[in-house]
Amino acid sequence: MPSVVVVGTQWGDEGKGKITDFLSSNAEVIARYQGGDNAGHTIVIDGKKFKLHLIPSGIFFPEKISVIGNGVVVNPKSLIEEIAYLAENGVSANSLRISDRAHVILPYHKKLDFLQEEAKGDKKIGTTIKGIGPAYMDKAARVGIRIADLLDKEIFEERLRTNLEVKNREFVKMYDSEPLEFEEIFEEYYEYGQQLKKYVTDTSVILNDALDAGKRVLFEGAQGVMLDIDQGTYPFVTSSNPVAGGVTIGSGVGPSKISKVVGVCKAYTSRVGDGPFPTELFDEVGHQIREVGHEYGTTTGRPRRVGWFDSVVMRHAKRVSGLTNLSLNSIDVLSGLETVKICVAYERSNGEQITHYPASLKELADCKPIYEELPGWSEDITSCRTLEEIPEAARNYVRRVGELVGVRISTFSVGPGREQTNVLESVWGV
């Protein structure tokens, strides 16, 4: 029962969608296990760019099953729009399966997300205002509405009415904001549920049956380890667990059925929104990396913050997600730089060096990155298909990344296309 988990090892936007799409060719089931439409992944097929937020990358393979697991929070409106977007581009969603246990994002979640973020003033955490956090809050508070509830008119009406009464009191009394209308939400979202009904099932059964039958299953995470609510740069994190351990909770598959964990990273680092970023660049080199790498958020369109590769972050990701393999993306973006740097440790103001990522943001603010400098390369490597074809300086960089992280590099990418992903070692064993 071979199964592979794909996780982002930085702050998201590492190219997980591209790697999932690439690995999907040898998988029979592809499942998303956490997050919501706050995450975006871009896939390039035959030169055409597709941007998805909820539906797994495997949807481009009609013979494979694509699963939205119970750990995902689903905005029905966004999902229906995404299905329509795919249809307009000749891609069918007939192979999609949605967990009946997944929780639903409703208009009051998005409104609350906005109001809470605005109330923080200059202490905003950089939420995408998609309602993700409030939906997970309701789930933990045991007042959430699941897909199974959305499909049952009586249950949906009862729970929506109860929840909206509470939320409207909060909007009016705490935020001096207008209440939401029950009827409008009820009619609109019940109809969304009916449109999605044909895709809804117990996806835990599908996934476990597939694994028990020896089928190859690929699990696709959203965001990245450094945005994990437990292991990330709290409170500048998402509301779920992108780490590999999140698979078992968010898909209904036991940990004994996970074979390999592929960590996806870029040859540099990027981040959207606020929060600590030790290797961030503010100079012309940072600007060049941002422009060459097209570092603008898939969901928000916001310019991403960029910086040098941070092996301290990567070793943290390796430890907390149990990485077995590494997929190194966007090496081509570094072409043209005279020198390239890798952060190998942090130095505190008292001169002490540390090689682990601190939990305390105050402690982290006291740290400066210690860099190892390597020669850069000027050649265009976007057409290279083997490690031997890329310049020696680029080869040395790739090898050094693997050494510092302590994980085998199974693939490296020199561009956004499928054909620009090069295999050093198959994680499927094929």
Curated annotation (Swiss-Prot):
Organism of this sequence: Lactococcus lactis subsp. cremoris (strain MG1363)
Pfam families linked to this entry: Adenylsucc_synt
Residues that hold GTP according to the record: 12-18, 40-42, 304, 330-332, 413-415
Identification of the protein by name: Adenylosuccinate synthetase
GO biological process terms on file: 'de novo' AMP biosynthetic process; IMP metabolic process
Principal cellular location given in the protein's record: cytoplasm
Biological function: Plays an important role in the de novo pathway of purine nucleotide biosynthesis. Catalyzes the first committed step in the biosynthesis of AMP from IMP.
Cofactor: Mg(2+)
CDD domains found in the cross-reference section: AdSS
PANTHER family per UniProt: ADENYLOSUCCINATE SYNTHETASE
Cofactor note: Binds 1 Mg(2+) ion per subunit.
Pathway stated in the Swiss-Prot or TrEMBL entry: Purine metabolism; AMP biosynthesis via de novo pathway; AMP from IMP: step 1/2
Record: active site: 13 (proton acceptor), 41 (proton donor)
GO molecular-function terms, A-Z: adenylosuccinate synthase activity; GTP binding; magnesium ion binding
Gene Ontology annotations for the cellular component aspect, listed alphabetically: cytoplasm
Sequence positions that bind IMP: 13-16, 38-41, 128, 142, 223, 238, 302
List of residues binding Mg(2+): 13, 40
Keywords linked to the UniProt accession: Cytoplasm, GTP-binding, Ligase, Magnesium, Metal-binding, Nucleotide-binding, Purine biosynthesis
Protein residues bound to substrate: 298-304
Family according to the record: Belongs to the adenylosuccinate synthetase family.
Signal peptide boundaries: none
EC number: 6.3.4.4
Subunit details: Homodimer.
NCBIfam families, alphabetized: PRK01117.1, purA
Enzyme class: ligase
